[in-house]
UniProtKB/Swiss-Prot annotation:
GO terms for cellular component: plasma membrane. It comes from the Archaea. It holds the Pfam family SpoIIM. It comes from Methanocaldococcus jannaschii (strain ATCC 43067 / DSM 2661 / JAL-1 / JCM 10045 / NBRC 100440) (Methanococcus jannaschii). It is a multi-pass membrane protein. It is found in: Cell membrane. Keywords: Cell membrane, Membrane, Transmembrane, Transmembrane helix. This is Uncharacterized protein MJ0706. The lineage of its organism: Archaea, Methanobacteriati, Methanobacteriota, Methanomada group, Methanococci. The chain crosses the membrane at residues 33-53, 104-124, 132-152, 153-173, 186-206. The keyword Transmembrane helix applies. InterPro entries: SpoIIM-like (IPR002798).
């Protein structure tokens, strides 16, 4: 009887997690966590841009981080002569890796958020607003929310684990299950957005890059 009950609970949970309406409502229910992660991203972006512009050390550190980022992009083996499908698949692989990593890291995904803010602030400083608008914004307006959602999902997952392991104030089984379900809904939504962002980056952004660098 207990096994049958657990199976029924699991099936109900999976049905809820993959319900599109529930997935779309999840950001509203978890807006406080998402706003917190968004605030970390925005403050990091603004603060790091100010530091990169005004302090040489941060500009130098930005050089190192950006060079490592370029090496990572080169490892994807994307060139201006590649077909769109190859580019999109390579971007998807990279984006989904970041998405899952963000989720697994939990609260430590805020460090990933800060590093991405550093890269964006450095690109804006190094290449100027025009290049930033053309080469980052087309896919960035989708990719950045996806990054924030995956990090938010990771934070929620951590909250569930803390409740489970330490059994603090709201550490009931129902509360733990709620956190895990909500975190997975945000993860699924972030994956969807990362897929869309990859298509935009592999088509629109890529075409803009070809025009600018040809």
């Amino acid at each position: 009887m207990r096994d049958a009950y657990l199976m029924m609970v699991l099936m109900d949970a999976l049905k809820e997690i993959f319900d599109l309406k529930e997935i779309l409502k999840s950001p509203i229910r978890n807006k406080k966590v998402i706003l917190f992660v968004s605030l970390v991203f925005i403050l990091s972006l603004v603060l790091l841009y100010i530091l990169v512009v005004n302090i040489k050390y941060f500009s130098y550190l930005g050089d190192i981080i950006f060079q490592n980022f370029q090496k990572h992009v080169e490892n994807l083996k994307i060139t201006l002569n590649e077909d769109n499908l190859h580019i999109i698949l390579a971007i998807w692989k990279n984006n989904l890796t970041v998405c899952i990593l963000n989720y697994i890291l939990g609260i430590f995904s805020l460090f990933v958020i800060a590093v991405n803010s550093y890269i964006l602030s450095y690109v804006l400083y190094k290449f100027g607003a025009e290049s930033f608008i053309y080469l980052v914004l087309p896919h960035g307006i989708i990719e950045i929310p996806a990054l924030i959602l995956s990090a938010s999902g990771g934070v929620l997952f951590n909250m569930g684990l803390v409740n489970f392991l330490i059994n603090i104030k709201f550490g009931t089984k129902r509360e733990v299950l709620y956190y895990i379900k909500e975190s997975l809904k945000l993860l699924i939504l972030s994956i969807i957005l990362f897929i869309v962002a990859g298509i935009v980056e592999g088509t629109i952004t890529f075409k803009i890059a070809k025009i600018m660098f040809s």
